[in-house]
Amino acid sequence: MDKLENKSMANYDEYRAVVICASFSDCNQVLTTIKSIVCHNRFIKFYVINNDFPTEWFVSMQKKLAKLDCPIVNARVDASLVSNFKTDISYTVFLRYFVADFVEEEQALYLDCDIVVTRDLSEIFAVDLGSHPLVAVRDLGGEVYFGEQIFNSGVLLINVNYWRENDIAGQLIEMTDNLHDKVTQDDQSILNMFFENRWVELPFPYNCITLHTTFSDYEPEKGLYPPVIHYLPERKPWKEYTQSIYREVWWFYQGLDWSDIQEPVGALTQKMVEGEDDSSLSCLVYTYSCDLLHINYLIQALPSCHFYIAAPVVVAEPITRLLQYPNVSVSSDIAGIPALLESLEAKSQLLLDINAGDEVGDIIARFKSSGKPVFAFDSTVHGQQGQEVFPADNPEVMVQAIEKLGLAEPEERQISVLSIDQSLDYLLEKGASVVRFGDGEMDLIAGRGIPYQEYDPELSARLREMMAMESNERLMICLSDVFTGLERYSIDAQNFWKAHLQHHLADYLEICRAPWYGSTFISRPYIDLEDKTPSAGYFAKLKQLWQDKDLLIVEGLTSRSGVGNDLFDGARSIKRIICPSRNAYSKLEAIKQAVREHADNRLILTMLGPTAKVLVYDLVQEGYRALDIGHIDSEYEWFQMGASHKIKLSHKHTAEHNFDQDIEYRDDQAYDSQIVANLAQE
């Protein structure tokens, strides 16, 4: 087993092969897997290796997938394909052996049909297979239970050329014929025996087996899901009981209409799965017993409340019957799945202590320590643990209390943002660095790419982490000053921010818990202001930041900040590092190294979109001072023009004109002489 290396993450101009093997009895699962992939990816060529799918199914799928630039191939296996092999085993047992017989591409991603994909697959396809036959994720269950270093065969990146040239299918069929009755895990055992010490390891998130999360310290970025979720046979999400985490993710993709799948989404977010309205109440009953006092009455009296009923043992028929109600979920036999219980606790605002028999574990104490209420009847209460107790002969009283709990308005919390003046004064007084968060960064945090930066889960996680930080004398964290007083801005700006906050205010309130933030608008101090008279003072303070200082400007290829104006005339000297105008995050390490080589004691100014936030933060940890002041050049140009609206600049990048079209670069020897590194051309 070797460690993986990545190829260049270039844009794909060819199809990438995904292989699924199944019988038609699993067509609903195949459909769900395909929907999950095309929700986040384009230019995927699907090969469904099968022996019984109707032609009409493929005709229907071809029509749907063609609109998404994703063809599908009916890779049908029949007796003629295996006639040259001496075996008495049905070929349906080892359909995936035939990948190289159908796939035209050099590599193929094989996926079981009990899998959903929640992100762009580019990182997996970028793995360099070299001379290795396949890439896979280590099977943590095999390691924990049997001490075996094996891979799970549900996700395989296959070197198709290698398989074809070495007749891997023939060799695997021969081994299967000889050993099939001596192995415990069918073709997974055969594949591990055959490829022992010849496979490359892929990280756990790319085959996140729901039952194996207990054995891994991996946690997805907050608000997101693992890139590839794999549901094991005994606890499938399409069965009646909830017996694994991420069940709701499978049902989200299963329920997607094809009309819902338009532009690819970088990553599935919890908000997408749970919906915009997360105000509904949920409660948990955790029980050994099927005797739950007044449970039918409570469920019917509270149709807007969701009841999670869970048991560490297999539930009995009286519990199963409760699934007739749309506001009930049942989790059976979950004793060995702590992650599922934790998930149910997190979803529930209330614990109902209404079960006969013993309390399960310390569930009451766990809810109380989380600050969540526990309601009990006087005949079912388990000890005196701070429960709110209601009369068993009048369950309506408990219903009223639960309704009141659901109607309670959450405490209003305001996000405090300093004014532009206050923020600039802080930078001048403290000598702090600064990072600024705007609508583009929130889009990336929410799982969507923006015109000049593709979605990247690592970037998204880092942005979210920084947005939650408190400012200090070394680094000021800034937000857009739009949570109050929108009347300060132009009508267009007001409308934009109202729409933005309609979608993302809850995200800001969840993430941004620092006592105060600086203003992102320190570098946007003109065009969106209704009253533009203070702008001259703002620019004067900005210029004080670099007056008589040596500067290192880190910017995109088209930015050309300060070219053609006097914005940086007060600086002692200027050096520039030129970076890609798009997807600069892919060059982050190279950019940091270039900064180290040329920074000396210079003040670093960054104009590099979302990448600038991470760059500044990392540089501050290394002892540099850096200011993220993107868009400052466009704002200053408009200020000098006295513009009343956003005018496109002909000779360089213009804020909000994100595609950099029709730029006529002017020769500027001073600008050219300042460039000490050009990473945009590497």
Curated annotation (Swiss-Prot):
It holds the Pfam family GT-D. Mn(2+) binds at D112, D114, H230. One of its GO terms (molecular function) is metal ion binding. Gene3D superfamilies: Spore Coat Polysaccharide Biosynthesis Protein SpsA, Chain A. Keywords: Glycosyltransferase, Manganese, Metal-binding, Nucleotide-binding, Transferase. UDP binds at residues 21-26, 112-113, 230-236. The keyword Nucleotide-binding applies. Disruption phenotype: Alters carbohydrate composition of cell wall protein GspB, about 20% reduction in platelet binding by whole cells. The keyword tRNA-binding does not apply. Part of the accessory SecA2/SecY2 system specifically required to export GspB, a serine-rich repeat cell wall protein encoded upstream in the same operon. Part of the accessory SecA2/SecY2 protein translocation apparatus required to export cell wall protein GspB. NCBIfam families: glyco_access_1. Belongs to the glycosyltransferase 8 family. This is Probable glycosyl transferase Gly. It comes from Streptococcus gordonii. The gene is gly.
